[in-house]
């Protein structure tokens, strides 16, 4: 039976975490903090994702669990190890095409180009015929050799947490099941990456998203390999895994955060510094490594176009909002209405019903930059596309009424990157009557000039 998912605002989840995870002893072992692992588990419980409760052996005594892993190693032989170079890039596989039709990694292309090919290994998460990765994670089996001392040391640390979890009255039975499942996933991920990087010449690994990558970071820390995160989207004070409040000060140390994080501009560094998870020196302003064209927008390029930038897995909300625009479409027949789908949208068919209502649905046919050059107004809820629009002479509107996203939407307005918009408002009339048409933020604060030396130093620093 499928889960009945009840998505909750991040603001509410953050309050819940601050209340139930304020005591770091609940998730801290002798040498590690499993704060983020507990966050994953409790998030799934809160939203009703109970299929995330997995069969596992985390409650077994360490000796029994170790014996079981040794037996599995005999039955399931591990495949030969990949040969890796000094710097490894783990690419999520989001690609962008150039004018000649060639495909490039939107996140990793420029970072990879910093090093000679014989010094790097470019690994994709999944095989993609459009780009030549050195290897892909989905092609590597999860069969392991018998656990060595370092693996067993971590298993003992996890077992400390398991004992605490099972004996405390702080958690419900279902929450305990989620926590043990999350620890199981963490340990399996750790073993996967430990196998991948053990006895290799690797010095640094670059990836996006430190959250849900705790097993990777644990393996790198165990092996003395530098871990570097590069920013892949917006960072907000309302995030679940960034800008941790002082409530978590006792639980942040050794909580599987990367050694450094590269951000697009000083704007993002200022936000991150409000949290307790990174020190100033760990946050490196490396500039805009994404592929944006030079911005030379003139008034004559602008058209009477409204760009609605949809967000991943929010098709229900955006389709409903588009239908509510019917009065304004009829009131402004000389305006064009464009909906740009998120590149990772899984339910693109949901938008097809809007075509008869004068909406142009765009997937990969045109780049975001080309659309921003032409449109006068952009509408979304919370999105990096608001920041992408800086310098393009676009009026950004953030819809404020989608309940579970209202905290993020409010943040967009508070940060000065978008103006508030109610579902009932005519966006064209509102834009025409604004005293100030574009956000006060400067593009260079958000996307500073690419600093190749800063990024290279962040990746290689010991």
Regions found by a protein language model. Give the residues of each.
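Catalytic-core helical/loop segments in enzymes performing group transfer/polymerization on anionic/lipid-linked
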Residues: 1-462
């Amino acid at each position: 039976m499928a889960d009945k998912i009840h998505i909750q605002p991040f603001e509410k989840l953050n309050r819940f975490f601050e209340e139930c995870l304020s005591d770091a002893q609940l998730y801290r072992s002798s040498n590690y903090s499993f704060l983020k692992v507990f966050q994953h588990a409790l998030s799934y419980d809160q939203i009703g994702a109970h299929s995330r409760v997995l069969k596992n052996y985390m409650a077994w005594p360490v000796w029994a669990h170790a014996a079981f892993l040794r037996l599995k190693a005999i039955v399931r032989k591990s495949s030969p190890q990949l040969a890796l170079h000094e710097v490894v890039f783990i690419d999520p596989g989001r690609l962008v095409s150039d004018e000649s039709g060639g495909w490039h990694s939107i996140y990793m292309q420029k970072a990879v180009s910093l090093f000679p090919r014989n010094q790097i290994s470019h690994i994709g998460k999944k095989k993609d015929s459009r780009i030549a990765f050195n290897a892909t994670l989905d092609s590597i089996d999860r069969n392991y050799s018998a656990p060595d001392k370092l693996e067993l040391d971590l298993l003992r640390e996890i077992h400390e947490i398991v004992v605490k979890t099972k004996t405390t009255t702080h958690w419900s039975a279902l929450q305990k099941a989620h926590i043990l499942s999350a620890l199981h996933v963490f340990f399996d991920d750790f073993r996967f990456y430990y196998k991948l990087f053990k006895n290799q010449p690797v010095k640094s690994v670059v990836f996006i998203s430190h959250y849900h990558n705790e097993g990777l970071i644990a393996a790198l820390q165990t092996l003395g390999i530098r871990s570097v995160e590069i920013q892949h989207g917006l960072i907000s004070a309302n995030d679940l895994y960034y800008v941790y409040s002082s409530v978590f000060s006792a639980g942040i140390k050794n909580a599987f955060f990367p050694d450094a994080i590269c951000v697009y501009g000083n704007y993002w560094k200022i936000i991150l510094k409000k949290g307790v998870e990174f020190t100033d020196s760990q946050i490196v302003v490396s500039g805009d490594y994404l592929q944006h064209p030079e911005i030379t927008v003139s008034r004559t390029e602008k058209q009477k176009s409204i760009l609605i930038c949809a967000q991943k897995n929010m098709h229900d909300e955006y389709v409903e909002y588009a239908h509510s625009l019917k009065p304004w479409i009829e009131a402004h027949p000389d305006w064009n209405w464009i909906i740009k789908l998120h590149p990772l949208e899984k339910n693109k068919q949901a938008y097809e019903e809007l075509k008869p209502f004068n909406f142009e649905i765009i997937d990969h046919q045109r780049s975001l930059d080309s659309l921003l050059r032409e449109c006068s107004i952009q509408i979304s809820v919370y999105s990096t596309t608001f920041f992408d629009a800086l310098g393009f002479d676009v009026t950004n509107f953030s819809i404020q009424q989608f309940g579970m996203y209202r905290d993020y939407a409010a943040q967009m307005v508070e940060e000065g990157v978008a103006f508030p918009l109610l579902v009932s408002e005519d966006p064209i009339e509102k834009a025409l009557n604004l005293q100030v048409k574009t956000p006060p933020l400067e593009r260079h604060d958000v996307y500073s000039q690419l600093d190749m030396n800063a990024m290279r130093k962040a990746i290689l620093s010991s």
